[in-house]
Amino acid sequence: MEVIRSQKRTVSNDVVSTPTLPLYLTAPHMEVRLEEFELFAIDRLRVLKGVSDGLARARNPNEMDDLVETLWKEHMRLSNVSEMINKDIISHFVLRLVYCRSDELKKWFLSMETALFRHRFRLKKIEEQRAIVGEFGLPYKAVIGAELESLKERLGLVARSHGQISSDVENIYYKVPFEEVPDLVASRRVLLQKGFAFVAGTQLVSLVVTQFRSHLSKALILTNRKWTTTIREREKDRLTPIVEALSTSYLGPDYSQSNEYADISLKDIDQVSKSSFPLCMRHLFEKLREDHHLKHGGRMQLGLFLKGVGLKLDDALAFWREEFTKKVGSERFDKEYAYAIRHNYGKEGKRTDYTPYACSKIITSAPGAGDHHGCPYRHFSEDNLKAALSRMGLSSRGMEDVMDKVRNRHYQLACTLTFEAVYGTSCDTGINHPNQYFEESQKILKSKTPAAPV
């Protein structure tokens, strides 16, 4: 796959003729425009993050099928089938580059791509599923004749024990080494005999997913080797910055400018901090009021958040000045801190209009001693987090639900559950940005406020 700047993409016949559920066994022979390299990857990343959220919410297989179908239509579907397949393949291989770079990234990508493949496979008709099995070149053949007859009674018992009316709709079974289908063995959904599992045609997904995961796991190791030895340095001025940014990309709305739900003033800020700030910003705000100081990381995280919720530059300068001058003089504040505040608002230096930090950036930050920035769900001790959640009014049950997600490293979902517990309403999109939390909170609170009489 060769990335070019902006000319027409040429595609090999092999790519166009790929089945509608590619196996990604080999990289495609095609030229890809630089814009598509990034945009296709972002669209696929939206799908994978949706899958991650669905799994974290413990949705059942049928619900996950529906979710995957919806996510795919929303982010990956194109009117031209061959172009859609190309987008599928390109985006997968781009994200291989993005997520091969550390064990943590590889683990996440491997799990999400495997889950995505599983549910896309489940959505295919049985004939298409068998064709995909053939594409893998698996050596397993259907059990027929006397061997099948001798097993029919026991196969029927296994099937009926899981609610099937007959042993199998198609009466087709595959004889495979039991270690190839660990999930079916663990759930006792297959007949075992002499080291083999007899897998029904309707259970092909388990067999294929094992192969898919094994292949992708090995491929990520090879991709990492190529990335570190050649690609990263060779593409340092072109692809490398895109690849390194994608794994922490925020994919939601732009909160750099305030909107109808984001317009606060100094007189409201203390009350609003208690009613609508997410825990990360509430903690920073309280530490600032308590200590009259925050280190650089905390000032950036809170300052840009306040900018995004509508605090004007003059009010921001007055807010920070009021706190900091309780410990340092006005002259020192103007010299050491005021410039940085104006800089964040695009009034100094390169005049860049800086955007508030998204959850992905906050979670991956590394606060040190004396720092208060970062994500409380990741960086707080369990006792400190429980105390903070208690101050937000969470019940014991709600707190335990949140802590369960924290222990499983689903930090954004933990924040989402906190939001749902505080406001008594669901947040199906999940919390991906502190300013999103604030905006959704304000919508709820303002909807409950009686309209002023005319």
From Swiss-Prot:
Instruction: Print the keywords alphabetically.
Output: 4Fe-4S, DNA replication, DNA-binding, Iron, Iron-sulfur, Metal-binding, Primosome
> What's one GO-annotated cellular component?
alpha DNA polymerase:primase complex
Which Gene Ontology molecular-function terms are recorded? 4 iron, 4 sulfur cluster binding; DNA binding; metal ion binding
BP terms from Gene Ontology: DNA replication, synthesis of primer
Q: Does the keyword Iron apply?
A: yes
Q: How is the cofactor bound?
A: Binds 1 [4Fe-4S] cluster.
Q: Which cofactor does it need?
A: [4Fe-4S] cluster
Q: How is the quaternary structure described?
A: Heterodimer of a small subunit and a large subunit.
User: Which family is it part of?
Assistant: Belongs to the eukaryotic-type primase large subunit family.
The role this protein plays is: DNA primase is the polymerase that synthesizes small RNA primers for the Okazaki fragments made during discontinuous DNA replication.
What protein does this entry describe?
Answer: Probable DNA primase large subunit
Give the species this sequence originates from: Arabidopsis thaliana
